[in-house]
């Protein structure tokens, strides 16, 4: 897992670099989902082709929590969809890398997202269309736990179970924080695993920073065709990897200063080196 640890660290470093360069963005929730994206794009879970993003039979990924676009852009760049150097154009005039993903501009982005609550509906519609057409391909959507306060999420959950969309997996980035503070204090969705089960979903829980475990559970969901959509509750830490950002709601949407960036990058590299030595 040493190589994927390196990839996840590279994603986190680039997330911070591009947000610092743009002086705007969402580091907390981007850092919390970096290991999930590493597992999907580099762990052999997603069937995809950077040279042919619209390949027939591909798997589909939707970033429902579109404000974490820096994490998706970093993953796509390192996977080969566009040059890594382009990451530094985040949020700049004329860039393909908008503050939230734009499918008309950025290769590898399946749909424009950022309006919270809509991503799972789009994923469910895609999964339903694939099933009706008898086409290959699994569909994955990454949601925030704060996003699950949106009622549309539960309409999509009900529809997905009713249509037996077992080609659909919803991954919940369960970091416990949103822009205004703790999810449980803003508008608690209660136990999300119990809730998805009540809607007729197959539910699995995983450490959202354990890449081996993530790959195992995501592949298990992908291979399971038992008539139920799949929900993966990934326990994560907002701002993961940077001690002064971890579990701090204030880092939901704030760019680091030059000094903070330097400290964060040094901490991430030191942790990666330690992990490699242990491995």
Q: Regions from the language model: what does each represent?
A:
Residues 1-69:
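N-terminal amphipathic, basic-rich helices that act as targeting or association modules
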Residues 1-4, 8, 12, 29-34, ...:
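Generic structural signal for well-ordered, non-membrane alpha-helical segments
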Residues 19-23, 76, 200-203:
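Short amphipathic alpha-helical interaction patches enriched in hydrophobic/aromatic residues
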Residues 34-39, 70-74, 121-128:
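Contiguous, well-ordered alpha-helical segments that form the cores/surfaces of helical PPI scaffolds
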Residues 39-44, 78-79, 159:
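Active-site catalytic microenvironments for nucleophilic, acid-base chemistry
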Residues 47-54, 58-60, 100-279:
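Glycine-rich ThDP/TPP pyrophosphate-binding loop and its adjacent helix/strand module
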Residues 73-82:
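Alpha-helical support elements that line or immediately flank enzyme active sites
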Residues 83-102:
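Anionic-ligand anchoring segments at beta-strand to alpha-helix junctions in alpha/beta enzyme folds, i.e.
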């Amino acid at each position: 897992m040493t190589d994927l640890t390196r990839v996840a660290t590279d994603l986190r470093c680039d997330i911070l670099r591009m947000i610092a360069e743009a002086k705007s963005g969402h580091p907390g929730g981007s850092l919390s989902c970096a290991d999930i994206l590493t597992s999907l794009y580099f762990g052999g879970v997603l069937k995809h082709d950077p040279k042919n993003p619209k390949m027939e039979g591909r798997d589909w990924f939707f970033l429902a929590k579109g404000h974490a676009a820096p994490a998706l852009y970093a993953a796509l760049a390192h996977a080969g969809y566009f040059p890594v150097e382009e990451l530094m154009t985040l949020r700049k005039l004329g860039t393909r890398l908008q503050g939230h993903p734009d499918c008309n501009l950025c290769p590898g982005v399946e749909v424009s997202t950022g309006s919270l609550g809509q991503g799972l509906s789009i994923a469910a519609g895609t999964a339903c269309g694939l099933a009706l057409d008898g086409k290959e391909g699994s569909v994955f959507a990454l949601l925030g736990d704060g996003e699950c306060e949106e009622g549309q999420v539960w309409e999509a959950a009900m529809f997905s179970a009713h249509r037996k969309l077992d080609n659909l997996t919803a991954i919940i980035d369960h970091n416990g924080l949103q822009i205004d503070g703790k999810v449980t204090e803003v508008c608690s969705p209660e136990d999300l695993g119990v809730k998805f089960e009540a809607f007729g979903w197959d539910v699995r829980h995983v450490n959202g920073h354990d890449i081996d475990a993530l790959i195992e559970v995501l592949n298990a969901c992908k291979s399971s065709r038992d008539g139920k959509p799949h929900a993966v509750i990934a326990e994560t830490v907002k701002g993961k990897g940077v001690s002064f950002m971890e579990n701090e709601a204030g880092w939901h949407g704030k760019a680091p200063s030059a000094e903070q960036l330097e400290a964060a990058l040094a901490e991430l590299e030191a942790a990666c080196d330690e992990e490699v030595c242990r491995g």
